[in-house]
UniProtKB/Swiss-Prot annotation:
Cited function: Component of chylomicrons, very low-density lipoproteins (VLDL), low-density lipoproteins (LDL), and high-density lipoproteins (HDL) in plasma. Plays an important role in lipoprotein metabolism as an activator of lipoprotein lipase.
Species of origin: Ellobius talpinus (Northern mole vole)
Location(s), subcellular: Secreted
Annotated signal sequence range: 1-22
Gene field: APOC2
Protein name stated in the entry: Apolipoprotein C-II
Source species taxonomy: Eukaryota, Metazoa, Chordata, Craniata, Vertebrata
Length: 100
């Protein structure tokens, strides 16, 4: 068991040494240039904004009042049904827990 412990300790120290070395190399890079993470975040944010704007434009171009009314009606009916079933389920669970 002592050799396993030493092997595990050696591996942990090796990983920590690699992390410290990588952190030092990152600090030695030019501090004036933005980090890779910042570039990735900006790129993803740009793509997201573009996709959101395109989706909003498409929605506004294809907006139909009758479809919107049907969707609202379907949502209200389904949420009412889910509320009913959730209350029935809650009542059944409480009955099982109380033992009535």
């Amino acid at each position: 068991m002592g050799s396993r412990f030493l092997l595990a300790l050696f591996l942990v120290l090796l990983v920590l040494g690699c992390e410290v070395q990588a952190a030092q190399q990152l600090q030695q890079d030019d501090p004036g240039s933005p980090a890779l993470l910042d570039k990735v975040q900006e790129s993803i944010s740009s793509y997201w904004d573009t996709a959101k704007a395109a989706a909003q434009d498409l929605y506004q171009k294809t907006y139909l009042t009758s479809v919107d009314e049907k969707l609202r009606d379907m949502y209200s009916k389904s949420s009412a049904a889910m509320t009913t079933y959730a209350s029935i389920f809650t009542d059944q669970i409480l009955t099982l827990l109380k033992g009535e």
